[in-house]
């Protein structure tokens, strides 16, 4: 902005609206108001607008490969950054919070479909104090494009960003009998979600319900009939693991993808559900947002025992065209928090619970080769030409029959139509 002469008076500044500054409601409350933007606090003249609205942080825009669901979180990125910088990653220690009373006096959980919901963990908090979350939490949420709402909802979103595990908070008074039922939707059932839209659900979809009604679409969005409001006095925090393929099918039918659904689709570990819940309760206690009741309610049908795989390190070297000693492989894997040891002609690898991309069985050698290769450095691997036999292609009998049928129908006067495969069937 340069000094400008307006009506004979030199003006050295300008009063701007949030829109003129390129701000949205997620960046600063009231930024989308049609008029001059009003700051809610006193700020010294000459202060940078970035500092005044809390947008002075450094934001990293990171492109992830689809298989690394664990990196959709601050902690996941920190693990990778520590490995890249040669630093030891310090795993966050969650302070356990012991609640008073018995949670079963307030709530209960039953899971009817454990295949689609292998784990459902919940925690009751009463005597809620609903208020804006602290400035530091609001600032961090805005930095990642989330709009602060209140302390309880913000805690669930903060844990989502920090641990990469979606959470939800129900108004416990709106859950009939305090009983949560994880079940498939019924015929002709509808749910009004938090965005105010009535959505028709089908029996293939998983629903969070109480004995009377649906209170949320599992892994996608909570229901409007149980949302946290200023009048909420007790809440049930939910941290669950839902089957990614089912959530993907649900979002396609509903034509609606949320941040939570995107993470479930890529895969979340049942172990992480319990950690996320513990972190949320720790924040509730730190912010004095309510009274924690009893112990967690945990319905777990998943195998959460540590996963151990045996890897043929000679095969790893063959895949990479390298000659790395097994002892060096152990050291390389340790830099990315994957413990391992040499056992004869194998590497015995303890797979961290968050590394859902590392498979067991015949894929294990290839997955560990990928990890060893990126730590060793692909530039250090000697280039070689691809070797292999080529075969003459041929059209299969099924395709021949299909082409013959098409030719016959066209000869009879029919027209062949090619539809776009990426549009909804109704269009």
What are these regions (language model features)?
Residues 1-399, 403-410:
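RNA/tRNA-interacting regions in translation and RNA-turnover enzymes
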Residues 148, 416-421:
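Structured aminoacyl-transfer and RNA-binding surfaces used for tRNA recognition/handling
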Residues 421-427:
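Residue-level detector of conserved catalytic or cofactor/ligand-binding positions
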